[in-house]
């Protein structure tokens, strides 16, 4: 998951954008990019919204997989390029920037984290595949992210039960 903070001010938008890319065995199977419902007061708040939206998508797809008999492996990894987004999910008392609508999302994320449904993993922005979905990117950056996705897919394929033998 990823978010930008403040949207695209060239067009008068202050609403952040959430980008989500779900992968299975290194292959993206679901992605989306949406404006967030309200203006985030900080990049951490925007990241929490993105993480909660990502977990909603993950939960739905994992539930469907379980319903049709596909074994599901918890916890899932959420790649996050914002240290504050990882820190706030574990912090007991959110600061004033996360009051209101973010309290519900943060509480839900903490609950899922405590139930071992996901692990947030810090990843460099350059390697965050969802980064492409939050803002217009230069061709150079898009190519780099495409190569990173290919590398990730090959790495996962080598370690999976399907490939690498």
Question: What does each model-identified segment do?
Answer:
Residues 1-46:
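RNase H-like nuclease fold core
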Residues 37-165:
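RNase H-like nuclease module associated with reverse transcription
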């Amino acid at each position: 998951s990823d978010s930008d903070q403040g949207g695209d001010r060239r067009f008068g938008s202050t609403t952040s954008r959430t980008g989500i890319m779900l992968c299975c065995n290194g292959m993206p199977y679901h992605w989306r990019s949406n404006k967030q419902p309200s203006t985030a007061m900080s990049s951490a708040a925007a990241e929490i919204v993105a993480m909660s939206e990502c977990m909603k998508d993950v939960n739905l797809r994992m539930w469907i997989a379980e319903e049709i008999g596909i074994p599901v492996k918890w916890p899932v990894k959420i790649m996050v390029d914002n240290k504050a987004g990882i820190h706030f999910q574990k912090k007991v008392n959110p600061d004033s920037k996360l009051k209101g609508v973010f309290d519900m999302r943060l509480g839900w994320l903490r609950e899922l984290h405590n139930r071992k449904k996901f692990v947030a993993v810090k990843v460099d922005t350059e390697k965050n595949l969802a980064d492409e979905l939050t803002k217009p990117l230069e061709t150079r950056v898009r190519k780099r992210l495409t190569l990173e996705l290919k590398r990730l897919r090959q790495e996962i394929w080598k370690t999976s039960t399907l490939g690498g033998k």
